[in-house]
Swiss-Prot record:
ATP binds at G125, T126, H127, G128, K129, T130, T131. Cell wall formation. NCBIfam families: murC. This is UDP-N-acetylmuramate--L-alanine ligase. Keywords: ATP-binding, Cell cycle, Cell division, Cell shape, Cell wall biogenesis/degradation, Cytoplasm, Ligase, Nucleotide-binding, Peptidoglycan synthesis. It comes from Haemophilus ducreyi (strain 35000HP / ATCC 700724).
Length: 475
């Protein structure tokens, strides 16, 4: 008997003319996941990126044709070209595709096609999307449902960020950064929180951003379900506008799935969830912080509403190893001045940084927190400048790297020097600016003390720098 996976192409007859799919920016987390799923479905996949990476090597090994650098001839043979929001309109591959009348579509449009004939779950929100998507993927896997998943980061337990499952279930991270998640039409949607970010997409208007989220949730069928965080005021503000069934979760006393008695020791958190029928579920997590309890409870609420057994839910959450670069321990290292713990974290928004610091304080109360922070994008630094100043003042020692531009031009008074100046003026911590990253290890050895917890924080190339540092320290 043929599996769902064997029949998927027959279920999408409209794509029968599509033979080769080309991805511009294939090394990106969201792009690579979709490319891998389509490759495993049997499509010919090609793609380009400006640098070779572990991701592009993995796709090449799996059978994709990978080009390093963007050239018009790279699209030869393509039936459709998929682009990420990071790619400029004047990219030579996009120009060539348009000249050849080859369709050029957004990443989310292709994800929507993968979703079309599956029972799909989309996870949206400013923070927590990747971890919640990973948790859901592991719960469904533990329950024997073998879901397809497409995540924006590594699912550690699976060793990859995407998987083509044999069942009809699909779990995907929904990207609000360019509002392209409006292409998605899932059966069930999660919204973890809504805060100002990527405001250029929304014309600098937070009200417009809220409206787009409502439209996203109204893409649910009338029998669909919105799972929404009761702790987020903005999420609860838009809930009455959704026009679909809403289930809430959180620490809030009015939440349908309510968290009680959260406690944390080191990396481990444990708490109780009170379900709508007053059933009590005791949850153990090996990822720290109140924010991860929220992520896990969002996943738990979805799974309960979908009829998954408690044993599978609780086992998957207890075994969950985290998502890539989310409070990711790189090891404990002996340095000249003592032994230190090194953590890598992707958080680059003030709220994400705040919850990371809170988790570190709660789990390691007697450690000094040394943060290495690399701001990501000048526009984000400008838009959230005061919030960055306040949150970065909450660590014990702060090392500031230069802004990771991510293709943006510099903005006056939105750089690392300006941040350092304002943080210093606040008087709580005296930041150290390290513009030459080759000196990072030397600077750290001068300031770290025994028992320090070092947080490497940011979404740019700081992870690469920190992992190289860990290799050097291990040697």
């Amino acid at each position: 008997m043929k599996s769902y996976q064997d029949n998927i192409k027959k279920l999408v007859p409209e794509m029968r003319r599509v033979k080769q799919i080309h991805f511009v920016g294939i090394g990106g987390a969201g792009m690579s996941g979709i490319a891998e799923v389509l490759l495993n479905e049997g499509y010919q996949i090609s793609g380009s990126d400006i640098v070779e990476s572990i991701v592009t090597k993995h796709l090449a090994d799996a059978g994709a044709k990978i080009f390093i650098g963007h050239q018009a001839e790279n699209i030869a043979g393509a039936s459709v070209v998929v682009v990420s929001s990071a790619i400029e309109e004047n990219n030579p591959e996009i120009t060539a595709a348009k000249s050849a009348r080859i369709p050029v579509i957004q990443r989310a449009q292709m994800l929507a096609e993968i979703m079309r004939f599956r029972h799909s779950i989309a996870v949206a929100g400013t923070h927590g999307k990747t971890t919640t998507t990973a948790m859901l993927s592991m719960i469904y896997t533990e329950a024997g449902l073998d879901p397809t998943f497409v995540n924006g980061g590594l699912v550690k337990s699976a060793g990859k960020n995407a998987h083509l499952g044999a069942s009809r279930y699909l779990i995907a991270e929904a990207d609000e950064s360019d509002a392209s998640f409006l292409h998605l039409q899932p059966m069930l949607s999660v919204v973890t929180n809504i805060e100002p970010d990527h405001m250029d997409t929304y014309g600098g208007d937070f009200e417009q951003m809220k409206t787009i989220y409502v439209k996203f949730l109204r893409n649910l069928p009338f029998y669909g379900l919105a799972v929404m965080c009761a702790d987020d005021d903005v999420v609860m503000e838009i809930a009455p506008q959704v026009g679909r069934q809403v289930i809430s979760y959180g620490f809030n006393a009015n939440a349908d799935y309510r968290i009680e008695n959260y406690q944390q020791t080191g990396f481990q958190g444990h708490y109780t969830v009170i379900c709508p029928n007053n059933e009590r579920l005791d949850v153990v997590l090996n990822v720290p912080g109140h924010h991860n309890a929220l992520n896990a409870t969002a996943a738990l609420a979805v799974a309960k509403e979908e009829g998954i057994a408690n044993d599978a839910i609780l086992a998957a959450l207890a075994d969950f190893q985290g998502a890539g670069r989310r409070f990711d321990p790189l090891g404990t290292f002996k340095r000249p001045n003592g032994t230190v713990m090194l953590i890598d974290d992707y958080g680059h928004h003030p709220t994400e940084i705040a919850v990371t610091i809170k988790a570190a304080r709660q789990g390691w109360q007697h450690k000094r927190i040394v943060m290495i922070f690399q701001p990501h994008r000048y526009s984000r630094t400008r838009d959230l400048f005061d919030d960055f100043v306040n949150v970065l003042s909450k660590v014990d020692v702060l090392i500031m790297l230069d802004v990771y531009a991510a293709g943006e031009n510099a903005i006056v008074k939105a750089d690392s020097k300006a941040l350092c100046r304002s943080i210093r003026n606040l008087g709580k911590v005296d930041p150290i600016l390290v513009s030459d990253t080759s000196q990072l290890g030397e600077v750290l050895d001068q300031i770290i003390q025994d028992n320090d917890l070092i947080l490497a924080q940011g979404a740019g190339n700081i992870s690469k720098l920190t992992r190289k540092l860990a290799e050097d320290w291990q040697a």
